[in-house]
């Protein structure tokens, strides 16, 4: 890694290895700072929001060091560094851009504008020059040591000073910016101390191992960001817009809803769009994990980033700049970094006292034996310096976020978006799942199966009235009724004063008369009681069409189970997770679905009833609520974790803690398995980190290990923890 100096140039910098997440405490983790960012303005409730793009962060400890430096500035209300998307966000009452840039420059970091082009990457030779230089100098020093001890000692001192200079400089910068216990500080003290007592070879070896750890750290950071980088690369930089019969190449930021664009075969959509071409196949695997191309017809929505498989297509832009499907996913990733798991917060608090405590122990080990027992100063100074290096909490600090980030990335690859470590941790504890029925267990596209009008009205008239009231509604049943009327080519009149009745139905004025569409049982319908019972017993949903309090007839609709619903329920049972259906549908229709899946159910529930049921179930064991509609949002909020189907409403997706973008219920099983695997991984990582520290603490006091083994142990623990966390990315 390299750290920018005050003039924006890169200087060699050595930092121990760390992985792929938002680490808790910059002061505590092995990293150095090469960060640069971008200032963009937006209004915020707490003042003005400024944002920069941050480049060069090789571990999440860099993010915490940047936060530390900015947080000390007067006038800063809030500061966040989002490691996955390399973004610095500062909320302030006044324009503090100059102060932020100055503070970070003094701390050894540089900033660039968020909209600026990516900085060109340094050549591999330049990037690895510090490591190569130190290896060559180390080899020369060993050679000289074999033939001439004095010259060998001088060579080791020179090697140490060359490696130490950038580290000590960065340590001073970080101390000035408030990061007192950064690994750069520990390394500087240990190397200088080793030189002081004549352990020149070990001082040089410590720095060499440190630099190797830094290169591993850079590799881990790039692996951590691969998913986000791939997602950002899904959007092309330009689009072909059709205007007045002419084609023009425009930047995607200039596209607006209503624009008509053209995408060639093999091209990616620059924005969410509505298909205007007759039909086409789209590869949406990068967004949803769905490997099979999806067939779309005229009027269907297609997300940004999807690829037109086999033909030139025309679409109408639906999304504003920065509000496409890809942008929403990136926003979820940013939000996920803000929602840290409880165990992450615990490790953060623990690490804040761990390093100072180890430094205090090292000082006592250095002073007490020589002062009280006349022991050798050189021996105990050496042991104290070794303990100082053991005090680096890199492996411990990254043990949790490395696993959580890998878990979140693995879930995203499979089309499951989990909003942060807290949600992932909660998901791993779930032993119950409550399902909404329509749109969750079923495909959410019911069809009209029967129309039964009262005497004196035709089927067409009944369907026309119902479609007029339901036009524009988002509920799957409403859309099915409108779709049926459109297929029949009926002239649908315009309804006025349309009003949704919570838990009951929807009403409107049609041709000056009040028409109500409601569930059977919400309005007296004695003449149709037998028919309603018969239809509901067959698993169909029945709605009444009421005009001026007179029941004009009933419309029956039926949805179909998702293809993988039965398999998903069976696999959940195998995991020890119990399922239950909570639905606003009638009991008979719910019973038909529940019987087919072998689930318990509660039917006829209003939104507040669902909340009550979820609260009661949640008191017995952690419960996940899976839904897709506005009426599911309160229940999802009340559950231990809310999970939205990707086809759900914006309200459901916003409320949920996780979402299945591909609408496959088996993805829920994979999410729970992955969450549990992540928990196990975290426990393993903490054991590795603390176990190795404990072992080397004892062996150091017994005189069995020295400085270079202490650094090797720290780097080794960090490598093991990171490698263990990366195993989650390979889970099937």
From Swiss-Prot:
Its EC number is 7.2.2.-, 7.2.2.12, 7.2.2.21. Changing residue 392 to A: Lack of activity. Cannot bind metal at the transmembrane site. Lack of phosphorylation with ATP. It is a multi-pass membrane protein. Residues 146, 198-202, 378-383, 703-707 are periplasmic. Disruption phenotype: Mutant exhibits hypersensitivity to zinc, cadmium, lead and, to a lesser extent, cobalt and nickel. Belongs to the cation transport ATPase (P-type) (TC 3.A.3) family. Type IB subfamily. This is Zinc/cadmium/lead-transporting P-type ATPase.
């Amino acid at each position: 890694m390299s750290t920018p100096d005050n003039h924006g140039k890169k200087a060699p910098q050595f930092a121990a290895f760390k992985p792929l997440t938002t680490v808790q405490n910059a002061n505590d983790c092995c990293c150095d700072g090469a960060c640069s960012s971008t200032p963009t303005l937006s209004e915020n409730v707490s003042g003005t929001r400024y944002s920069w793009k941050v480049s060069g962060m090789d571990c999440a400890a860099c993010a915490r060091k940047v936060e530390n430096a900015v947080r000390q500035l007067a006038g800063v209300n809030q500061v966040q560094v989002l490691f996955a998307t390399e973004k610095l966000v500062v909320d302030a009452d006044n324009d503090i851009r100059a102060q932020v840039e100055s503070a970070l420059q003094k701390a050894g970091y540089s900033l660039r504008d968020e909209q600026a082009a990516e900085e060109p990457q340094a050549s591999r030779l330049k990037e690895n020059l510090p490591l190569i230089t130190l290896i060559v100098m180390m080899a020369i020093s060993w050679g000289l040591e074999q033939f001439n001890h004095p010259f060998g000692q001088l060579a080791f001192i020179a090697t140490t000073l060359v490696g130490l200079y950038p580290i000590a400089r960065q340590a001073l910068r970080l101390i000035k910016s408030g990061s007192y216990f950064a690994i750069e500080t520990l390394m500087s003290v240990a190397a200088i101390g080793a030189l002081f007592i004549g352990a020149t070879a070990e001082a040089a070896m410590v720095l060499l191992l440190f630099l190797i750890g830094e290169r591993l750290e850079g590799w881990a950071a790039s692996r951590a960001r691969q998913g986000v980088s791939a997602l950002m690369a899904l959007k092309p930089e330009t689009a072909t817009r059709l205007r007045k019969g002419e084609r023009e190449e425009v930047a995607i930021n200039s596209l607006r809803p209503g624009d008509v664009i053209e995408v060639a075969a093999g091209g990616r959509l620059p924005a969410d769009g509505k298909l205007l071409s007759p039909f086409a196949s789209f590869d949406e695997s990068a967004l949803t994990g769905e490997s099979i191309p999806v067939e779309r017809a005229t009027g269907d929505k297609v997300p940004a980033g999807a690829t037109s498989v086999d033909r030139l297509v025309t679409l109408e832009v639906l999304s504003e700049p920065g509000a496409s499907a890809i942008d929403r996913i990136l926003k979820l990733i940013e939000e996920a970094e803000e929602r840290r798991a409880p165990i992450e917060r615990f490790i953060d608090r623990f690490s804040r006292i761990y390093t100072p405590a180890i430094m205090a122990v090292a000082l006592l080990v250095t002073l007490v034996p020589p002062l009280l027992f006349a022991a050798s100063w050189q021996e105990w100074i050496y042991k104290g310096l070794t303990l100082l290096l053991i005090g680096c909490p890199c492996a411990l600090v990254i043990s949790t976020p490395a696993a959580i980030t890998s878990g979140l990335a693995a879930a995203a690859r499979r089309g499951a978006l989990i909003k942060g470590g807290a949600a992932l941790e909660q998901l791993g504890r779930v032993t119950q799942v409550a399902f909404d029925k329509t749109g969750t267990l079923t495909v959410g596209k019911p069809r009209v199966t029967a129309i039964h009008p009262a005497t004196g009205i035709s089927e067409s008239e009944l369907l026309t009235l119902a479609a007029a009231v339901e036009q524009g509604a988002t509920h799957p049943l409403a859309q099915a009724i409108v779709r049926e009327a459109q297929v029949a080519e009926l002239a649908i009149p315009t309804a006025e004063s349309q009003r949704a009745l919570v838990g009951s139905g929807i009403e409107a004025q049609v041709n000056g008369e009040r028409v109500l569409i409601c569930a059977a049982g919400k309005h007296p319908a004695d003449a149709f009681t037998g028919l309603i019972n018969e239809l509901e017993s067959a698993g169909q949903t029945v709605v009444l069409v009421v005009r001026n309090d007179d029941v004009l007839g009933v419309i029956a609709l039926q949805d179909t189970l998702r293809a993988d619903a039965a398999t998903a329920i069976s696999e959940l049972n195998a995991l020890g997770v119990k399922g239950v259906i909570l639905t606003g549908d009638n009991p008979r229709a719910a019973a038909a679905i529940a019987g087919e899946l072998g689930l318990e159910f509660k039917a006829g529930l209003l939104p507040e009833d669902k909340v009550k049921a979820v609260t009661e179930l949640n008191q017995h064991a952690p419960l996940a609520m899976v839904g897709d509609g506005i009426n599911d949002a309160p229940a999802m909020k009340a559950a231990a974790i809310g999970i939205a189907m990707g086809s759900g409403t914006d309200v459901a997706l916003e409320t949920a803690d996780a979402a299945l973008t591909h609408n496959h219920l088996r993805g829920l099983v994979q999410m729970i398995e992955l969450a549990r695997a992540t928990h196990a991984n975290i426990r393993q990582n903490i054991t590795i980190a603390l176990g190795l520290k404990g072992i080397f603490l004892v062996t150091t006091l017994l005189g069995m290990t020295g400085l270079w083994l202490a650094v090797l142990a720290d780097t080794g623990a960090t490598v093991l923890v990171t490698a263990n966390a990366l195993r989650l990315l390979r889970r099937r």
